[in-house]
């Protein structure tokens, strides 16, 4: 009889265990996925060299921190458009490859898309589960229109979204000078 009471008590305790909460609400997950789609619209516009499509996900009050160091100054809407037009004029076949590179996360499977991250469990600022700040990793591939040189840049972006789901804060990091080096190396190799 003691065994039956013990087994019954043990089953009762185990069945009352709280479900594990991974800290991600369905609302925040949906918001995160929508922001990924907005970023994909942005990169699709780049690929098609369609300024209207690219800018369709950009807020009028965008503050952009370009990959070239400029003393920490942010650039507004008109400067952002001007930079995009410069890319479209200078390059063709522009495409973004999400998360290209090794998957270094110990808990992730080899096929996981590690391009997009949001929220912060550990932070020097206040930890948050709010997905309004998106971190994106990948590679931009391109072909230089004038020389025909093909190249690519590893890229990291910090993107903030407003309540309408548009990008209002954008900092991107890449070896901007490396683009010129790749073009120059192509020109040198084609002269030999």
Which residues does each PLM region occupy?
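Positively charged n-region of N-terminal signal peptides that target proteins for export
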Residues: 1-4
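C-terminal motif of bacterial Sec signal peptides marking the signal peptidase cleavage site
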Residues: 12-15
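C-terminal and inter-domain tail/linker signature
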Residues: 17-192
């Amino acid at each position: 009889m003691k065994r039956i009471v013990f087994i019954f008590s043990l089953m009762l305790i185990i069945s009352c265990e709280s479900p594990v909460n991974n800290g991600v609400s369905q609302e925040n997950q949906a918001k995160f996925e929508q922001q990924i789609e907005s970023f994909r619209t942005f990169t699709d516009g780049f690929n098609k060299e369609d300024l209207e499509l690219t800018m369709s996900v950009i807020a009028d009050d965008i503050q952009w921190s370009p990959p070239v160091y400029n003393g920490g100054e942010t650039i507004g809407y008109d400067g952002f458009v001007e930079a995009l037009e410069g890319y479209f004029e200078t390059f063709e076949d522009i495409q973004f490859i999400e998360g290209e590179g090794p998957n270094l996360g110990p808990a992730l499977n080899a096929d996981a898309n590690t391009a997009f991250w949001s929220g912060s469990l550990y932070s020097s600022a206040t930890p948050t589960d709010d997905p309004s700040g998106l971190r994106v990793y990948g590679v931009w591939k391109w072909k230089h229109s004038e020389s025909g040189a093909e190249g690519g840049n590893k890229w990291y972006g910090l993107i903030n979204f407003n309540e309408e789901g548009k990008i209002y804060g954008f900092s991107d990091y890449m070896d901007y000078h490396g683009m010129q080096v790749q073009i120059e190396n192509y020109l040198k190799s084609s002269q030999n």
